[in-house]
Structure formats: structure tokens, C-alpha cells
UniProtKB/Swiss-Prot annotation:
Entries under Gene3D superfamilies matching the protein: 1.10.287.370
Organism this protein belongs to: Caenorhabditis briggsae
Tagged with keyword Chaperone: yes
Entries under CDD domains matching the protein: Prefoldin_5 (cd23157)
Family: Belongs to the prefoldin subunit alpha family.
Taxonomic superkingdom: Eukaryota
Pfam families: Prefoldin (PF02996)
Xref: InterPro entries: PFD_alpha_archaea, Prefoldin, Prefoldin_subunit_alpha
Keywords, sorted A to Z: Chaperone
A Gene Ontology cellular-component term: cytoplasm
Name the UniProt record assigns to this protein: Probable prefoldin subunit 5
Function: Binds specifically to cytosolic chaperonin (c-CPN) and transfers target proteins to it. Binds to nascent polypeptide chain and promotes folding in an environment in which there are many competing pathways for nonnative proteins.
Subunit structure, interactors included: Heterohexamer of two PFD-alpha type and four PFD-beta type subunits.
GO molecular function (one): unfolded protein binding
Length: 154
């Protein structure tokens, strides 16, 4: 037996319920916005990795360069073989790959992250739309109560 889910019209909710719903929607929106920003940053870092891979392509053995360990920390390193690259394959695991395989990994990561960005972007649009509906219902309910109070006082 499956239970069919049905929504409750916003007009039937009390101001308190609408306020709670609005608060929950804002929290979800914040969560998805943070996720979106994190994914965009990850996509940017992946692009930098692809760019660095291309920069090393023109290097020769024995060439020295500054290698970023973080956004603000660099070390001087000597390129021993311009065709071999250390690539992080997940949670701190690195593997040595040739340029083409490394580029393949970066391209797959880019594609995967781009799909995730697209998904979260769609969710964000829907959450913003939901927030607008809830806000409109809240305003309508407040105006109706104010009008009701004014007619009772008259």
C-alpha cells in the first residue's frame, strides 16, 4: 500500500506555520547556495590544474618552478620529467600519470562537477521560487488579518 503525498495549500496555514516554513526554506536555500559556491570553487581549482598541466607541457627536464601547495604557500621544485604528473585521485591519494591520463582525469572531474553545479543550480531556482510563494502567502495572510482587525474596530 502506497500513501499518496498531498500538499497543503499555503492559504490554509497559520501565520506561525508560514513563518516556520519560510525559515526552513531560507535554511535550505542557504545550504544549497553554500553547496553551489563550494562546487564553483572546486571547478575553478580543477581548471587551474588543467592550466598547470598545459604550462608544464612546455617545460624541460631540470626546469625549476614554484609549485603551489595552497593558495598562499609555494615551494621551489625541479621538473624531473615533464611527461609525468602527480595527480590526486581522491582524499589525499596521489598517483603518477602521464600527461594524457592526467588530463583525462581532470576532464572527467570537470564534467562531473559541472553536472553537480547544474543540478544544484536547478534546485536553487526551485527553492527561490518556493520562497517567493511562501513570502507572498505570508504577506497576503498578514494583510487579511490587518483588514479583519480594521473592520472589527469600526
Amino acid at each position: 500500500m502506497t500513501e499518496e503525498q498531498r500538499g497543503v495549500p499555503l492559504s490554509e496555514l497559520s501565520l506561525q506555520q508560514l513563518g516556520e516554513l519560510q525559515k526552513n526554506c531560507e535554511q535550505e536555500l542557504t545550504f544549497f547556495q553554500d553547496s553551489f559556491n563550494a562546487l564553483k570553487a572546486l571547478l575553478s581549482r580543477n581548471e587551474k590544474s588543467i592550466s598547470a598541466l598545459e604550462d608544464v607541457k612546455v617545460g624541460t627536464a631540470g626546469h625549476t618552478a614554484l609549485i603551489p601547495l595552497s593558495e598562499s604557500l609555494y615551494i621551489r621544485a625541479e621538473l624531473s620529467d615533464p611527461n609525468k604528473h602527480m595527480v590526486e585521485i581522491g582524499t589525499g591519494y596521489f598517483v603518477e600519470l602521464d600527461r594524457e591520463k592526467a588530463k583525462g582525469i581532470f576532464d572527467r572531474k570537470k564534467e562531473h562537477i559541472a553536472k553537480q553545479v547544474e543540478t544544484v543550480e536547478g534546485i536553487l531556482k526551485e527553492k527561490r521560487r518556493t520562497r517567493a510563494y511562501i513570502s507572498d502567502a505570508f504577506q497576503t495572510k498578514v494583510q487579511a488579518q490587518l483588514a479583519n482587525m480594521n473592520t472589527q474596530q469600526s
